[in-house]
Regions:
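Non-catalytic accessory segments flanking enzymatic or RNA/DNA-binding domains
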Residues: 1-98
Length: 98
């Protein structure tokens, strides 16, 4: 049985960050996008690390907005191994062209 992946999704309009877990982060993105007026992008996923979700939610609790959504300012508090996997330059290009 496959372990859940940890994923990081960002909203284009608000910059909000969602940290969650799913067996299929791409499918989860599509579910979240349905009915959401803001464009969402999967900005990072980590195979088999879904078990770290709760720890990250606790670590970032100061930045929590609602449920699993956090203000953009939380990125400075992300563990280095997660922060470094996000391709920030490519992300800027994506938001600017969509």
């Amino acid at each position: 049985m496959k372990n859940d992946d940890l994923y990081v999704i960002q909203s284009d309009n608000t910059g909000m960050i969602k940290i969650g877990r799913s067996i299929n982060p791409e499918k989860r993105l599509k579910q979240l996008q349905t009915g959401n007026p803001n464009k969402l992008k999967l900005i990072a996923s980590f195979e088999g690390l879904g078990w770290k979700e709760k720890m990250l939610h606790e670590q970032l609790s100061f930045y929590r907005l609602e449920g699993e959504w956090f203000s953009y300012e939380c990125v400075g508090e992300l563990p280095l191994n997660i922060y470094e996997k996000i391709e920030w330059g490519a992300l800027d290009d994506w938001w600017n062209n969509n």
